[in-house]
Amino acid sequence: MANNPEGATKEEPRDLKVERISAGAPGQGPEKPQVIVAPSADVLSGATSTDVPDLGEGTYLAAYWGERPTGGYSLAAESARLEGNRVAVRLTLKKPPRGAILTQALTYPYAVAVVRDLDPRGKRFSFTDQNGTDLGWPVRLVS
């Protein structure tokens, strides 16, 4: 911790540990990309109407890529960094390889993860892709 000129304590930027809980591409889900952030597995379970396993303390998140035209898409929460009250989470979005034989059905890729050592209260969340491009996805904080 460092002191700024006004004497207030300021936390140094730090990388946060992200643990994967689940991921997939089911046949139903939100049509547009979005992220839900919660202070516990129980709260995220209620917000998503699913059973999110409780892996202990941390900030839980569910990221939805939205509707995709075929199978072969995947999404993962890879890393997170805390700078002041801003949390930047990097997602990896993978498209199917060109020429791949794909399921011809609408799919809805998602990823559920827990960010360790982070209390979501008072934080602003942003999400980027693997190239660092801001996704601009809406983020819903639930408590």
Report residues per predicted region:
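Exposed, flexible binding/inhibitory loops of compact, secreted disulfide-stabilized domains
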Residues: 1-143
